[in-house]
């Protein structure tokens, strides 16, 4: 069981308690923490759509500390990030691996940051399948299609050539924050809040 801190705020009717993530959502801050899976992705998508409905002109901040996870769940978040009108600033604290790194790169150009000791990792998608030979062949074709799609998404957001992205994602490719900036996944490494213009 995870302990989530509560924040108590005074109101005209007394005090009101929020869990810390709900309170931060009021400030237009969304957290992506832990493995990316369907339920978590649905919550993030709902938060993005809610914040857009509340104010389509005001920026959203997304803080990422994730080892990655299910590709389709991550792509639902990615597509929603591209779909909504507000600009989305992304910030890696801790790690942004696999789908986490794709979401980090998907932030608004110029607003993608990482803290100095963050670790970013890109790689090709992986999967394991069992069953009849024909079913395995179907799944193998699908994972190759997903690999190709992810490569093009990284090309779009990093500005790298497709051949560079393919070579860089052949195996687990761990990067420091500075290396991720050089690669084009982020725009800036920040040490203090004053270093960021969001």
Curated annotation (Swiss-Prot):
E.C. number: 3.4.21.92
An MF annotation (GO) of this entry: serine-type endopeptidase activity
Keywords: Cytoplasm, Hydrolase, Protease, Serine protease
Coiled-coil features, chain-numbered ranges: none
Location of the active site: 98 (nucleophile), 123
CC per GO annotation: cytoplasm; endopeptidase Clp complex
InterPro entries: ClpP, ClpP/crotonase-like_dom_sf, ClpP/TepA, ClpP_His_AS, ClpP_Ser_AS
Reactions listed under catalytic activity: Hydrolysis of proteins to small peptides in the presence of ATP and magnesium. alpha-casein is the usual test substrate. In the absence of ATP, only oligopeptides shorter than five residues are hydrolyzed (such as succinyl-Leu-Tyr-|-NHMec, and Leu-Tyr-Leu-|-Tyr-Trp, in which cleavage of the -Tyr-|-Leu- and -Tyr-|-Trp bonds also occurs)
PROSITE patterns registered for this protein in UniProt: CLP_PROTEASE_HIS, CLP_PROTEASE_SER
KW Protease (keyword) present: yes
GO-annotated biological processes: protein quality control for misfolded or incompletely synthesized proteins
SUPFAM superfamilies xrefs: ClpP/crotonase
Location(s), subcellular: Cytoplasm
Pfam families: CLP_protease
Enzyme class: hydrolase
NCBIfam families: clpP (TIGR00493), PRK00277.1 (NF001368), PRK12553.1 (NF009205)
PANTHER family: ATP-DEPENDENT CLP PROTEASE PROTEOLYTIC SUBUNIT (PTHR10381:SF70)
Annotated function: Cleaves peptides in various proteins in a process that requires ATP hydrolysis. Has a chymotrypsin-like activity. Plays a major role in the degradation of misfolded proteins.
HAMAP family per the UniProt record, alphabetical: ClpP (MF_00444)
Subunit structure: Fourteen ClpP subunits assemble into 2 heptameric rings which stack back to back to give a disk-like structure with a central cavity, resembling the structure of eukaryotic proteasomes.
Family: Belongs to the peptidase S14 family.
UniProt protein name: ATP-dependent Clp protease proteolytic subunit
Organism: Ehrlichia ruminantium (strain Gardel)
